Amino acid sequence: MSNAGHPEIRAAGVLLMVPGSPPSFLLMDHGHRLDLPKGHLEEGETDLEGALREMEEETGISRAVVSIDPTFRHEIRYRVREIRYGREPRNKVVVIFLGWLAERAQVVATEHAGHRWYSWISRQKIQAQTIDEVLNAVENHFGGKVPAPAGGA
C-alpha cells in the first residue's frame, strides 16, 4: 500500500534502566496495556530531543539524571491507522534510546494509570509489538549478557 502524500509518523522514547543484579527497567501502565515512556515528535525535534521530552512529561524524571547510552538506538517500523490522521494507513517509526539511572527515581505518572519497575529476565515476554523487541535488542546490544551501563556499575 502506498504512503504517497503522507509523511511517516515519528515517535521516540527511552527505555529507562537501573543497574543491579538483575538490572530493572521502567514501564508505564496505560490501564489496558504497558508501554515505554514515549510519544510523537513535535515539529523540529530530533529523535533524541523528543524521546527525552516525552520521558520527562510521562515520568517526571529529569533528563539531567539520565545517562543515555550513545551506542544504542533501536527503530521499530509498522503501519498504523490513527484517529488523528483520519484512520488513513501510515508508516510509523518509533525510535528507542537506552537511558541509565543511578537508582530508581520517583516516578510521577502524569499521563498514565501508573508505572512498574521490572527486573531484567532474559528474553521475557511482556508486549510483542514494541517492548519485547526493544528488550531483545538491548540484550543483543550487550552480547546476550545482562545489560550494564558503560564503565560498569
Features from the language model and the residues they span:
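Conserved N-terminal beta-strand and adjoining loop/helix that marks the start
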Residues: M1-F25
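Glycine-rich, flexible loop segments associated with nucleotide phosphate handling
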Residues: E8, S24-L26, R84-V94, E139
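A generic structural signal for ordered secondary structure
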Residues: M17-L26, L98, E139-G143
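Short, solvent-exposed aromatic-acidic interface loops
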Residues: M28-R33
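A short gly/proline-enriched turn/hairpin at secondary-structure junctions
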Residues: D35-G39
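Unchanged
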Residues: H40-E133
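Charged phosphate-binding loop/patch that engages nucleotide di/tri-phosphates or the phosphate backbone
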Residues: Q124-A153
